[in-house]
A protein has these predicted regions:
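Short loop/turn segments at secondary-structure transitions that flank enzyme active sites
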Residues: 19, 48-53, 144, 163-166, ...
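Structured loops at beta-to-helix junctions and adjacent beta-edge loops in soluble globular domains
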Residues: 16, 45, 141, 175-177
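Cys-His-centered catalytic/binding microenvironment captured across papain-like cysteine peptidases
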Residues: 148-154, 163-237
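Extended, compositionally biased low-complexity polar/Lys-Gly-rich tracts
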Residues: 83-106, 136, 157, 172, ...
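N-terminal low-complexity, intrinsically disordered segments
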Residues: 1, 8-28, 189-195, 228-236
Length: 237
């Protein structure tokens, strides 16, 4: 299959979505008004990115500056709504997504040692997929409990290649929805997922390295993903 290139398939805006889950009054009509929101659509952005890859079309080139003062397309915009739909598919509203969501819950409650061992198995699965030319979605685990409210710290990225660095360490090249592609930059897009250099950090043995920042993770797994063809108004957004 053709290579996945961030300049073609990484979105040009960050994962700064706010999802309006529910709003209303408690008690109804006469009570105080409440709003429940969640932050981010990393899974939707990762899934949508791969959808465009499988379609052999670049993602829409809309960028942060197009939506000022916001930094992302608003609700009602074709691309925003498609990403939201794919966010739900990634964890909730498809049987593959349910499996992903359940694995996030289960793995979040594992001991550091058990989670690390399972993540090593997932490293091998990821390498095998990439050797076949198949980019994949990786679920990054940071939560330390199986509570639903704890799951917001977990994350989803696209793994599109791997390499061995000068120290012999395996590194995955990823598209991180939190790190948008900047078409105006002369620097190559580079975000790396690898085992942490500090061997004593048993609690957080993986690190995601992006420009100016390193995030630490408990482990990761290869997610279930199935391509979907976006509607024409999404492709042309």
């Amino acid at each position: 299959m053709r290579p996945y290139k961030p300049e073609d398939y990484a979105f040009r805006f960050p994962n700064a979505f706010v999802n309006q889950v529910w709003s209303g009054r408690i008690p109804p009509r006469i009570g105080r008004e409440y709003k429940i929101t969640t932050s981010g659509r990393c899974g939707g952005m990762a899934f949508a990115s791969l959808d465009f890859y499988h379609l052999a079309l670049p993602v829409p080139t809309v960028k942060t500056q197009d939506f000022a003062p916001a930094s992302v397309p608003p609700d009602g915009h074709p691309l925003s709504d498609y990403i939201y739909t794919r966010q739900l598919h990634s964890m909730l509203t498809s049987w593959r997504g349910v499996l992903n969501g359940l694995r996030f819950l289960h793995w979040s409650g594992l001991s550091p040692q058990r989670l690390h061992q399972k993540s090593l198995d997932e490293e091998r699965k990821a390498v095998e997929s990439l050797d076949r030319g198949r980019p994949l979605v990786l679920g990054l685990v940071k939560a330390t409990s199986r509570g639903l409210t704890a799951q917001g710290v977990n994350h989803q990225v696209v793994g599109y290649d791997y390499r061995t660095n000068e120290s012999g360490q395996l590194e995955f090249l990823v598209y991180d929805p939190n790190e948008p592609f900047d078409a105006s930059s002369n620097e190559a897009y580079q975000v790396i997922l690898r085992r942490a250099v500090d061997p004593d950090n048993a609690e957080l043995p993986y690190e995601l390295i992006r420009p100016g920042r390193i995030d630490q993770w408990r482990g990761f797994f290869v997610q279930h993903y199935r391509p979907r063809v976006p509607a024409e108004h999404v492709i042309n957004a």
